[in-house]
Amino acid sequence: MPVLVITGTGTEVGKTVVTAAVAAAALAGGRTVAVLKAAQTGVGPDEAGDAQEVARLAGTATVAEVARFPDPLAPGTAARRAGRTPVRPEEVAEAATKLATEHDLVLVEGAGGLLVRFDAEGGTLADVAGLLDAPVLLVTSAGLGTLNTTELTARELRSRGLELPGLVIGSWPGAPDLAARCNLADLPDVSGAPLLGAVPAGAGSLSPAAFRSAAPHWLAPPLDGTWDADAFGDRHGP
């Protein structure tokens, strides 16, 4: 099944911009792409959410949400506060499966980190990936503190028998500090997975045309790009 689940080590690590970059690179390669947001929180009914931002940046991707809730909280908490039925992992998996019959690639973007709860029963994005038997791309931050959250997420994925094809740094700084430079080597070591890209900080503020043109250069060949981890490390490592 052509489904890739995208999660992060936490909030604000660049998941949506990375999702847009993966979509843009796949579209540039001639594939049809759908982006499914499992649960959108923190936006009103008439506001653009993460899926719409992906479409704005990436281009002609099909976008969908399973549910959205107004409070900027974990999906389970936001659903409870709104008095609404929470999202169930089975719903997300069903929606992704349907999209997969009509598209070459389906990107399922989570909310927050891997184990953020969808419902009172403890359903998470990890359960969605398990139901779909889909690989999980992990978006990480560049700097100090990322090694612990990255390793914890990688361990959880493997404990569930889920595939971790690689990591993408969601916001590579223009002037990386020593920790960020060292992490280029340390992130693959602690996670047991290769670096598959680094999206520059501020990429989401580019014009859609500039974003689409640049996206393949931020991602490695397994993600339809031309980025080379060794060359990047030679330029930016300590």
Swiss-Prot record:
It catalyses: (7R,8S)-7,8-diammoniononanoate + CO2 + ATP = (4R,5S)-dethiobiotin + ADP + phosphate + 3 H(+). One of its GO terms (cellular component) is cytosol. It is an enzyme of class 6 (ligase). Gene3D superfamilies: P-loop containing nucleotide triphosphate hydrolases (3.40.50.300). It comes from the Bacteria. Pathway: Cofactor biosynthesis; biotin biosynthesis; biotin from 7,8-diaminononanoate: step 1/2. It holds the Pfam family AAA_26. Catalyzes a mechanistically unusual reaction, the ATP-dependent insertion of CO2 between the N7 and N8 nitrogen atoms of 7,8-diaminopelargonic acid (DAPA, also called 7,8-diammoniononanoate) to form a ureido ring. This is ATP-dependent dethiobiotin synthetase BioD. It comes from Streptomyces coelicolor (strain ATCC BAA-471 / A3(2) / M145). The gene is bioD.
